[in-house]
């Protein structure tokens, strides 16, 4: 009878060991699936973050370029206005003299 109990006990231990192996295997599979899911989510978040940073950078760069262009145009306009004022002040006396001469001269 002890041999039957021993055989039954051994069989029960083997069955328990197989069940434990299945449980461990299922746990490993679940762990790997969770790790893969976490990795995929992390990669997605990194890509979204990278895209957002790239968009912010492009916005900043284009804004800086527009500001620089506007400042450059303002500076060029100021220089041209100054040049025109200087040119007009140099010739304005001659133009006034020419107009006065033209208006006061009578045709014969």
UniProtKB/Swiss-Prot annotation:
GO terms for molecular function: proton-transporting ATPase activity, rotational mechanism. Signal peptide: none annotated. It is a peripheral membrane protein. Residues 54-74 are annotated as: Disordered. The keyword Nuclease does not apply. InterPro entries: V-ATPase_G. Residues 7-97 form a coiled coil. It comes from the Eukaryota. Catalytic subunit of the peripheral V1 complex of vacuolar ATPase (V-ATPase). V-ATPase is responsible for acidifying a variety of intracellular compartments in eukaryotic cells. This is V-type proton ATPase subunit G3. It comes from Arabidopsis thaliana.
């Amino acid at each position: 009878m002890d041999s039957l109990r021993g055989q039954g006990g051994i069989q029960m231990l083997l069955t328990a060991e197989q069940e434990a192996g299945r449980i461990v295997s299922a746990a490993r599979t679940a762990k790997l699936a969770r790790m893969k899911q976490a990795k995929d989510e992390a990669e997605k978040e990194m890509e979204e973050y990278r895209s957002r940073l790239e968009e912010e950078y492009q916005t900043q760069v284009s804004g800086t370029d527009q500001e620089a262009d506007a400042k450059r145009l303002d500076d060029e306009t100021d220089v041209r206005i100054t040049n025109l004022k200087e040119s007009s002040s140099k010739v304005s006396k001659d133009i006034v003299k020419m107009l006065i001469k033209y208006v006061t001269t009578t045709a014969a």
